[in-house]
């Protein structure tokens, strides 16, 4: 019987799931919008909501808890310094999930998970390597 089993396994080991969601949390906080499969988005949402609540409460111990969960100090800094003040008057519901059709290749249901009242300029910021251009004078 499947009583009391709340979370999806997503066909991964526990360590893989934990690492994947840590990376996804960091990516969502960095870009404020990511595209993923619908089940992953549904599993990610409560993790991110709890992290934003930690950020709203503030304090060194809660900052360290967020670092332990996310493993990305720069994004924890953004969480506590930028996102937490933005949502100080909102009681939960910091993210939304929008269905985004089906993926070509395996027909997996896709979704966009994003912060409510997100900063549109944050998407794509510092993503991947940048090619250096040499100026010919």
Curated annotation (Swiss-Prot):
GO cellular component: cytosolic large ribosomal subunit
Ribonucleoprotein found in the keyword field: yes
InterPro entries: Ribosomal_bL17, Ribosomal_bL17_CS, Ribosomal_bL17_sf
Single biological process term from Gene Ontology: translation
Keywords: Ribonucleoprotein, Ribosomal protein
Short name of one Pfam family: Ribosomal_L17
Gene Ontology molecular-function annotations: structural constituent of ribosome
Similarity comment: family membership: Belongs to the bacterial ribosomal protein bL17 family.
Record text on subunit structure and interactions: Part of the 50S ribosomal subunit. Contacts protein L32.
Protein name stated in the entry: Large ribosomal subunit protein bL17
Organism: Bradyrhizobium sp. (strain BTAi1 / ATCC BAA-1182)
């Amino acid at each position: 019987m499947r009583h009391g089993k709340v979370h999806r396994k997503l066909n991964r080991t526990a360590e893989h799931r934990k690492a994947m969601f840590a990376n996804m949390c960091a990516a969502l906080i960095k870009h404020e919008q990511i595209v993923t499969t619908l089940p992953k988005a549904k599993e990610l949402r409560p993790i991110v909501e709890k992290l934003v609540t930690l950020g709203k409460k503030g304090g060194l111990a809660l900052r360290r808890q967020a670092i332990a969960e996310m493993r990305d100090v720069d994004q924890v800094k953004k969480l506590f310094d930028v996102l937490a003040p933005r949502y100080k008057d909102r009681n939960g519901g910091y993210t939304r999930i929008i269905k985004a059709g089906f993926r070509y290749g395996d027909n997996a249901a896709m979704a966009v998970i994003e912060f409510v009242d997100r900063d549109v300029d944050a998407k794509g910021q510092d993503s991947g390597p940048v090619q250096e251009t040499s100026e010919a004078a």
